[in-house]
Amino acid sequence: MKLNVSYPATGCQKLFEVVDEHKLRVFYEKRMGQVVEADILGDEWKGYQLRIAGGNDKQGFPMKQGVLTHGRVRLLLKKGHSCYRPRRTGERKRKSVRGCIVDANMSVLALVVLKKGEKDIPGLTDTTIPRRLGPKRASKIRKLYNLSKEDDVRRFVVRRPLPAKDNKKATSKAPKIQRLITPVVLQRKHRRIALKKKRQIASKEASADYAKLLVQRKKESKAKREEAKRRRSASIRESKSSVSSDKK
């Protein structure tokens, strides 16, 4: 079985191939997310604690968190589920995934170093790979440098150096800070609120005018009906009087 071990503190990961079955028994019947003491893997692993992050079986099917079996199952997956990437909007698909329990049929096991031991492991804990990009969101930059709301975040942005080309001076590039509160942002917000209030007032006035117009139209229609009723009653009286005069 191969062990793909990553160490977030240095940003490194390394693939180890373990042939001895006895060394791997410490991982068997363990679930994803469980912490394992790695002393049995060798002297250089003494004191290390590893968390099981996932893995693939010998046919390439991935482990899925929450599936409490060591075998393979077919699940109906949709957007947001692990082990599946939808190609169309709203698409669902039945996919074969492996349970979250480790057994001997695993090909690769993904592990994360939670606690470093006594010795360094070459290529994993002795070298540090610097992050290519720094944080972009204003709140995360504040969290990284422990800044208050009064501090200017723009001075603390991690700039990325660009190599010099065509006999030009080397430059650096900074990301656009997201969710940064500036006077322009506040101005736009106040404008949005003012427009919303203006629309509300205009809507209230329009509804009041419509209510007045509705009352006026009802009065007019009522007056028309009463006028028509009077005319009908007057014409009926006239017809009755003409009939009675003819009889005489």
UniProtKB/Swiss-Prot annotation:
Description of how the protein assembles with itself and partners: Component of the small ribosomal subunit. Part of the small subunit (SSU) processome, composed of more than 70 proteins and the RNA chaperone small nucleolar RNA (snoRNA) U3.
One GO molecular-function entry: structural constituent of ribosome
Feature: compositional bias, Basic and acidic residues: 223-248
SMART domains from the UniProt entry: Ribosomal_S6e
Record Gene3D superfamilies: 1.20.5.2650
Chief place of localization: cytoplasm
Region: Disordered, residue numbers: 215-248
Modified residues (Phosphoserine): S233, S235, S239, S242, S244, S245
Function statement: Component of the 40S small ribosomal subunit. Plays an important role in controlling cell growth and proliferation through the selective translation of particular classes of mRNA. Part of the small subunit (SSU) processome, first precursor of the small eukaryotic ribosomal subunit.
Transmembrane portions of the chain: none
Taxonomy of the source species: Eukaryota, Metazoa, Ecdysozoa, Arthropoda, Hexapoda
Cross-referenced InterPro entries: Ribosomal_eS6, Ribosomal_eS6-like, Ribosomal_eS6_CS
Keywords for the protein's UniProt record, in alphabetical order: Cytoplasm, Nucleus, Phosphoprotein, Ribonucleoprotein, Ribosomal protein
One GO CC term on file: small-subunit processome
Protein name as annotated: Small ribosomal subunit protein eS6
GO biological process: cytoplasmic translation; ribosomal small subunit biogenesis
Family: Belongs to the eukaryotic ribosomal protein eS6 family.
PTM annotation, UniProt: Ribosomal protein S6 is the major substrate of protein kinases in eukaryote ribosomes. The phosphorylation is stimulated by growth factors, tumor promoting agents, and mitogens. It is dephosphorylated at growth arrest.
